[in-house]
A protein has these predicted regions:
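Terminal connector regions
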Residues: 125-167, 177
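Bacterial signal peptide processing site
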Residues: 22-25
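Short, well-ordered beta-strand segments enriched in hydrophobic/aromatic residues
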Residues: 64-72
């Protein structure tokens, strides 16, 4: 009679332990999963109003910021990761890396909710060896790499880092706005 409660308690403990280890996900592809039972789908640019504001760098060596504000006009959606930003010049396209040490936090946007991210750059000289003559920037949202938005770049050339190839620019993670 005593062994039944001990056996039952052990079985119950094992079941609870195994259940606690399962997150209900499917593994590495969880961030791409758009199954409604696993939460909102990835946000798409086609459902966003896009506004751009800049604190342009006035002279070579100065730091400037370009803030992109997104307002969700569609159904609730989620941003998991960083925006992918490219700087476009006549002869090349350069990827902008996330800020050093930055960690992306998942952000869920309801209809009408707003978020923003910032491209920070160092204005370069009018010298192709030291700067990239950017004419546009393009960005996509995580989970929607084919849905790009391009904006005109009127903030001058972007400095190259000392390695001569990498641009001196970074992109922030998504910041929540409003309530």
């Amino acid at each position: 009679m005593r062994t039944l409660p001990v056996t039952l308690a052990a079985a119950l403990s094992a079941t609870l332990l195994l259940t606690a280890c399962d997150d209900g996900g499917t593994g590495a592809d969880d961030t791409k999963n758009t199954d409604p039972s696993n939460g909102p789908a990835a946000c798409a640019l086609r459902d966003m109003d896009v506004e751009v504001g800049a604190g342009a760098a006035p002279a070579a060596g100065d730091t400037g910021n370009v803030t992109v504000t997104l307002t969700n006009q569609g159904a609730q959606c989620t941003l998991k990761g960083f925006p992918a930003v490219d700087l476009l010049a006549d002869s090349s396209t350069t990827n902008v890396l996330p800020e050093e040490g930055a960690q992306a936090q998942p952000l869920t946007l309801g209809k009408g909710a707003t978020t923003s991210f910032t491209i920070t750059y160092v204005r370069g000289e009018d010298d192709p060896a030291k700067s990239l003559a950017v004419h546009a920037a393009s960005f996509t949202l995580p989970g929607a790499p084919r849905d790009a938005h391009e904006l005109k770049w009127s903030y001058g050339p972007v400095a190259r880092q000392e390695d001569g190839g990498t641009v001196d620019a970074t992109v922030s993670g998504f910041e929540s706005s409003g309530d």
